[in-house]
A protein has these predicted regions:
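Short, hydrophobic beta-strand segments that form beta-sheet elements in well-ordered domains
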Residues: 107-109
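Alpha/beta enzyme core
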Residues: 53-69, 73, 77-102, 112-259, ...
Length: 315
């Protein structure tokens, strides 16, 4: 099944053949969607979902699902091999200590630790996620981004998270944004690639929707809210807009795109709210730990504590 980019490229070629002056590829892709959304209408929609739907998802079954959707993350300047290995070993022990609970969906760290994680992880079904492409700023040469991504995959990464070139996006260089994402997706091949939008830096709902669509159009397998390194990370409003973009893209193309809220998920209720928004906007098809991921460190112990009914700091 082709992407929007494939379809638009064919349309452009046909128009050129008859001498029609056309919009650029990215303009044609965006023109198929309604980008005239306001922050006020998004906030109203989110408030309604929270008021009417969240309570029905605040239960043990949903919390177990959320635990199984976590990408257990360490992305600190002070990370060491010992710290990363300790995180891996906790995941290795989890099944024996909590046999009735789902293990986390993935471990997420910098790519210099990938081989260590790949060599020491013993649990089937847990992905190794790497942030590449000069995370968190994305401000470097494209060649550096491609080499880092290729090395991460060579060492055993099974998911790649990159940051959209936010500066290019804010300056209106949508072609540059798409070219970068597409180039890195070509490096990833069959390895799923998440594109981090850094929604807190984009300014408004319309910009978040535009960035979401451009990223999917350029090859993202998932879109992700944030690096967790900026002042504003994931919010219910940004997740709602991203879900709307995913739904519209899916309705037009039949291509399912995953979602990963990350950064600032500080409470179990935060996670329940995100899950509820996904359920209401995208539906049950997205409520698997393949299509829905959460990037977090602190939330994992909070979820586990609520599930077992006593405070624990296992992770």
């Amino acid at each position: 099944m082709g992407t929007i980019k494939d379809t638009v490229s064919k349309d452009i070629q046909a128009q050129k053949a008859v001498g029609i002056v056309e919009k650029s590829e990215y303009e044609q892709a965006l023109s198929q969607y309604n980008l005239n959304i306001t922050d006020e209408e998004v906030k109203a929609a989110v408030t309604k979902i929270i008021a009417e739907k969240v309570s029905e998802n605040d239960n043990l079954e949903v919390k177990k699902f959320l635990l199984g959707s976590v990408e257990l993350t360490t992305l600190s300047t002070t990370d060491t091999e010992e710290k990363v290995l300790e995180m891996v070993e906790k995941v290795n022990r989890f099944d024996s200590e909590y046999p009735d609970l789902p293990h986390v969906a993935a471990l997420c760290a910098y790519p210099c630790f990938t081989k260590l994680m790949a060599d020491s992880l013993e649990v089937d079904g847990v992905d190794i996620t790497n942030v590449t492409g000069n995370f968190p700023s994305s401000q470097t040469f494209l060649e550096v981004k491609t080499i880092e991504t290729a090395l991460a995959i060579k060492d055993g990464a099974t998911h790649i998270d990159i940051v959209m070139p936010v500066g290019k996006f804010l300056s209106g260089d949508y072609e540059g944004v798409c070219d970068t994402i597409n180039e890195l997706k070509q490096v990833c091949g069959d390895v799923p690639m998440k594109v981090i939008l850094e929604t807190g830096d984009l300014g408004n709902a319309s910009a978040i929707k535009t960035a979401s669509l451009l990223s999917m159009y350029a090859g993202a397998d998932y879109i992700k809210t944030s690096t967790g390194k900026e002042k504003i990370s994931a919010t219910p409003e940004s997740v709602y807009v991203m879900c709307q973009a995913i739904k519209e893209y899916y309705d037009k193309t039949g291509i399912q795109i995953g979602l990963k809220p990350a950064g600032g998920i500080n409470t179990v209720m935060d996670a329940v709210i995100y899950c509820t928004i996904v359920k209401e906007v995208l539906g049950e098809k997205w409520l698997t730990n393949y299509w829905f991921r959460m990037g977090t460190s602190r939330l994992t112990n909070l979820l586990l504590s609520e599930i077992i009914g006593t405070e624990t700091k296992f992770f």
